[in-house]
């Protein structure tokens, strides 16, 4: 970037993934978060804008605190990149914060931690009010067993058993710092905090934990699955509906705000 001509901005945004075909802009013009955001940014900047995201999300996956950076020669106040951009965005996307950052800041490569929540409804009948907002199973779940299995995820490990075949990550070794599983009012919440995640990793973990909770897989079997390092013997990938990117960690010097998880989630 020519720092004499352009400024680098970081924005935090939230979106409803059920309205879009994932994050990444596609050649066929289907609605994606990136395409909608870049169109809105261009309206404010008066020039084409290219964005770089902290982590791409798939179709149906939501975000409460995604982080993006972009460069522009346009000189605009902060509110132009928040309220102004929001005025040009379709329903389902909102910019929460904007901040001018150092020219070397990189939304993806400077991130040292990512937070995900999976919201799961466990009920005989799926609530129509939670469709696209939460995953669902009609099975009764043993939360204690699921919690024991989730604890086995913590640490630096090879997570090949939870890696999608099309994953482009250079290494399957990732570090999970926190894996909490709670239940209230029929909703199960899985919170994962790690340095990085493989493609479909959280959804594959959730699928395996549902197997544990329903008795189809023991805690010992879950541990063996991790050690197997093979996707071939793992339970199927769980639905995207309940998956939320809830935060990205950056060095404090960049001043990137990480919003609290909304109370409704």
Swiss-Prot record:
Domain of life: Bacteria
Listed EC numbers: 5.4.99.12
Record's catalysed reaction(s): uridine(38/39/40) in tRNA = pseudouridine(38/39/40) in tRNA
GO biological process entries: tRNA pseudouridine synthesis
Pfam families documented for this protein: PseudoU_synth_1
Keywords: Isomerase, tRNA processing
Protein function: Formation of pseudouridine at positions 38, 39 and 40 in the anticodon stem and loop of transfer RNAs.
Sequence similarity: Belongs to the tRNA pseudouridine synthase TruA family.
Name under which the protein is recorded: tRNA pseudouridine synthase A
Organism of origin: Neisseria meningitidis serogroup C (strain 053442)
Gene (name only): truA
